[in-house]
Amino acid sequence: MDINIDDILAELDKETTAVDSTKITQGSSSTTHRDANTIVGSSLDLNDKTQIYVSPQQDFSDLMKSWKNERCSPELLPYPHQLMKRLLNRISMQSQLIENISMGFLDMQNASNANPPMPNESKLPLLCMETELERLKFVIRSYIRCRLSKIDKFSLYLRQLNEDENSLISLTDLLSKDEIKYHDTHSLIWLKLVNDSILKYMPEELQAINDTEGSVNMIDEPDWNKFVFIHVNGPPDGKWNEDPLLQENEFGKPCYTVTIPDLKEEVELTIGSIYVMRYEVIRDLLRDDKVALI
């Protein structure tokens, strides 16, 4: 099976084709109440598992945070399944709305309801909607491409992670379904290429590609000692009193305490401040969404 980046990004362009007019002329109330001020699809979205209202603005903010974290992180971060599902659904709905407006279906409905159709001078909001939608697609594409580049780079590391029974995170949580397919196909092609080109001509004891017992680790792992810039956000749910890791420093400000292994020193990370730290030191705080990479 041949899988490339176009297969994973195809979902972003599925709903940009022409809309069937027979579905529009039914006078659905869910379409007529929308106008050119809609940001990304419907403003009402319910998470199927938790039934928590999530606004489009919050989804966009979470996407930008995930995008920045992924680009600045040396490792592959967990895939935000629910966030991406909502965003792709909003993109589909907004694309359909823009298509309806551009083809004049909403103008026809306004005329039938004794309302004047939209004049040509008022098409500017439509252009703004299209521009904003393309900006959102660009961020999602950049986010996915960044993840795919890490999947290519750490292919053997991900295979080892998947086979490790003591791993704290599963591959299904770390990758999306399409990314898992891409990873499996890419790793098989790469292993076959290396075996046919090099390994089969070498002695059997030298054919292992995942040897970690020698002086050089053959598995390319993320650089855990990489320095990163972080912004300390605090508890993501806003429940400051329920966070067991949150403390107060000598100035009475809330902070997190981390330990630098090399120096065996503790450092206080004050809420709202910016620091430069090794990634390994703040990795757990990043996973808990208590700090953000910048």
Curated annotation (Swiss-Prot):
SUPFAM superfamilies of this UniProt entry?
A: GINS helical bundle-like, PriA/YqbF domain
Matching entries from Gene3D superfamilies are given as:
1.20.58.1030, 3.40.5.60
Where is it localised?
Nucleus
Q: What is its main location?
A: nucleus
- Sorted alphabetically, which PANTHER family does this protein's record hold? DNA REPLICATION COMPLEX GINS PROTEIN SLD5 (PTHR21206:SF0), SLD5 PROTEIN (PTHR21206)
Give the quaternary structure.
Answer: Component of the GINS complex which is a heterotetramer composed of SLD5, PSF1, PSF2 and PSF3. Interacts with PSF2.
| Family label | Belongs to the GINS4/SLD5 family.
Q: What does this protein do?
A: Required for DNA replication. Functions as part of the GINS complex which plays an essential role in the initiation of DNA replication by binding to DNA replication origins and facilitating the assembly of the DNA replication machinery.
Q: What protein am I looking at?
A: DNA replication complex GINS protein SLD5
Q: Taxonomy-wise, where does this protein's organism fall, top ranks first?
A: Eukaryota, Fungi, Dikarya, Ascomycota, Saccharomycotina
Gene name per UniProt: SLD5
